C-alpha cells in the first residue's frame, strides 16, 4: 500500500504541492490528471524518493520512503533518453538484474521472458536506435517489469506516441495490471486515457500549491476495450466529470 500524508513540495520559495493526502491500496491502478504545470511529475518523483518530501510523509507498505525503494520501478515519457544506445535491447532490459547480482544466464532468461511478454522477442539483439518510438517504450516498460516491482510509477509514458501505438500500450498496461496485480500510479494529461486505464482518477488543481480537488472511482462494466468501452454511457459521463474538474475554477 502507498500512503501520502499531508505531503508538500517546493522549489525554493515556490510551492508546488500542498497537503496531498492519499491512500493507494495494493493492486490499484491510480491515474493522476491536472492542468499543465500543476506538479503531476513532481508528485511522482516525490513518491519515488527522487525528491524528498519537504512536508508530510510518504510510505510504501508502512516503511517511510527515504530513497528509491527496491520494490519500485519508474517509466518516464522520454523513453529515448532512458535507454542506453550502446546496449542491445536484451541488455537494456537485463541491466537492473545485473545490479542485483543475478548470474548472466538468469539475467538473459528473465529478460527474454519479459521481452516476449511485451511483444519484442524478435528484437532482443537490436539496439534502441534501430526501433520505433513505440518499441522503445516497450523496452522501457520491460526493463521496469523485469524485477517484478510491487509499485510501478509511470510519468506520461505514452504522451509522445501516435494514437494507435498509445492504444496498444494502454492495453498492454491493463494486461500487466490484470495479471500481476501491480500497484500503479499513472500520470497523464489525457483525460480519456485516465478513465480508460484507471481504477480511480485523482485530479490536481492548478499551481502554485496544487492540491487534490477530486478523487473519482472508475466503475465501468466488462473488460476494457478500446472501441466498446469508450462508447459506454458510463465512460462518457465520467470523462465529462473529470474534464469539468480539470477545467473548473473550483480547482483554482
What would you call each of these model-derived segments?
Residues 56-68, 110:
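Conserved ABC transporter NBD signature motif
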Residues 98, 105-123, 175:
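Conserved ABC ATPase "signature" region
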Residues 152-155:
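Catalytic Walker B motif of ABC-type/P-loop ATPase nucleotide-binding domains
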Residues 33-35:
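The feature captures the beta-strand-to-loop junction immediately N-terminal to the Walker
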Residues 126-129, 147:
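Conserved signature/switch motifs of ABC ATPase nucleotide-binding domains
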Residues 48:
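Helix-to-loop junction immediately C-terminal to a conserved catalytic motif
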Residues 86-94:
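Short coil-to-helix segment of the ABC ATPase nucleotide-binding domain corresponding to the Q-loop/switch region
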Amino acid at each position: 500500500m502507498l500512503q501520502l500524508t499531508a505531503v508538500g513540495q517546493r522549489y525554493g520559495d515556490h510551492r508546488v504541492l500542498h497537503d496531498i493526502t492519499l491512500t493507494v491500496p495494493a493492486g490499484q491502478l491510480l491515474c493522476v490528471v491536472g492542468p499543465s504545470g500543476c506538479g503531476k511529475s513532481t508528485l511522482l518523483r516525490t513518491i519515488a524518493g527522487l525528491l524528498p518530501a519537504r512536508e508530510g510523509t510518504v510510505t510504501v507498505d508502512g516503511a517511510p520512503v527515504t530513497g528509491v525503494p527496491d520494490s519500485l520501478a519508474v517509466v518516464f515519457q522520454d523513453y529515448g533518453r532512458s535507454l542506453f544506445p550502446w546496449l542491445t535491447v536484451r541488455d537494456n532490459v537485463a541491466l537492473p538484474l545485473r545490479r542485483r547480482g543475478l548470474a548472466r544466464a538468469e539475467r538473459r532468461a528473465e529478460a527474454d521472458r519479459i521481452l516476449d511478454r511485451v511483444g519484442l522477442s524478435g528484437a532482443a539483439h537490436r539496439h534502441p536506435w534501430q526501433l520505433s518510438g513505440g518499441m522503445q517504450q516497450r523496452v522501457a516498460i520491460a526493463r521496469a517489469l523485469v524485477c517484478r516491482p510491487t509499485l510501478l510509477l509511470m510519468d506520461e509514458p505514452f504522451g509522445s506516441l501516435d494514437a494507435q501505438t498509445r492504444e496498444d500500450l494502454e492495453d498492454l498496461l491493463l494486461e500487466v495490471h490484470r495479471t500481476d496485480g501491480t500497484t500503479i500510479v499513472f500520470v497523464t494529461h489525457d483525460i480519456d486515457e485516465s478513465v480508460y486505464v484507471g481504477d480511480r482518477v485523482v485530479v490536481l488543481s492548478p499551481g502554485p500549491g496544487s492540491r487534490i480537488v477530486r478523487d473519482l472511482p472508475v466503475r465501468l462494466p466488462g473488460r476494457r476495450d478500446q472501441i466498446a468501452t469508450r462508447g459506454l454511457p458510463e465512460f462518457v459521463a465520467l470523462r465529462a466529470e473529470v474534464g469539468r474538474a480539470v477545467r473548473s475554477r473550483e480547482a483554482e
